Amino acid sequence: MDFKIEKLPKVELHVHLDCCLSYEALIKIDPDVSLSTFKEKFIGTTCSCLKDYIKCADNALEYMQSKEQLEIVVEDLFNQFKEDNIVYAEVRFAPLLHINNGLSSREVVEIISNKTKLECLKSEIDVGLILCTLRHFTEEQSLETVNLVHQFSNENIVGFDIAADEAGFPLDNHIKAFEFAHKNNIYCTAHAGEALGAESVKSTLKNLKPHRIGHGVRCIDCLLYTSPSPRDS
């Protein structure tokens, strides 16, 4: 039997838009970036911790600040999906990270949402979008993000997430945003158990009550926190 994993249809539930910048997309935005620079600054061959890896995403974000740039990146991501035979994906991004060149957070969501819908029609790949707040965001920024999820609930925005450096920032600023999400029937996920241990997963489940945990690999540190139902933990 000629078995090739590349040909299998796949579901990808954890994609960060700012971590998917390919060299092909980058040189459409800035033709002067060399392949060696791309490998050094955007891939990171020596990332020893989450903070090091996030620096690569920060470099990519510099090229995701205009309508044209965002549309290039989204179209390129769909090309990557087609190469991997992805049939359904959930792509997350933080709108407030794309407003450095004059776009509003709402405009960012509109641009990415509209381009995603167009690419879905062209590719017949089904993609939902998840809006992220970040651990280092203020309470106001977190509430702004979840309100965008609510405002676009009739579009292709399917959920709310919290990402970034869990080791450096507590959950306090984000509790109200997740309470708002639950009151408005917004599906929630939360990154935890990646840079910290199982105790971080327990704290996240208790304080944010997400429907899913993103990563959660450190749950293995304590099997007590690997219940199939987060709401029962």
Locations of regions flagged by a protein language model:
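Divalent metal-dependent hydrolysis catalytic cores, especially in the metallo-beta-lactamase
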Residues: K10, Y53-E62, F81-N101, D126-C132, ...
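Divalent metal-binding pocket/active-site signature
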Residues: F93-D221
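Active-site gating loops and adjacent loop-to-helix segments of metal-dependent hydrolytic enzymes
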Residues: L26-E68
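Short amphipathic alpha-helices and their capping/turn segments at secondary-structure boundaries
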Residues: E71-K82, L223-L224
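Divalent metal-binding segments
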Residues: H16, K55-E75, N100-L103
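Conserved small/polar residues in nucleotide/adenosyl-binding loops
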Residues: Y225-D232
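Aromatic/hydrophobic pocket-lining residues that form π-stacking "cages" and hydrophobic walls in ligand
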Residues: L26, L77, I112, T116, ...
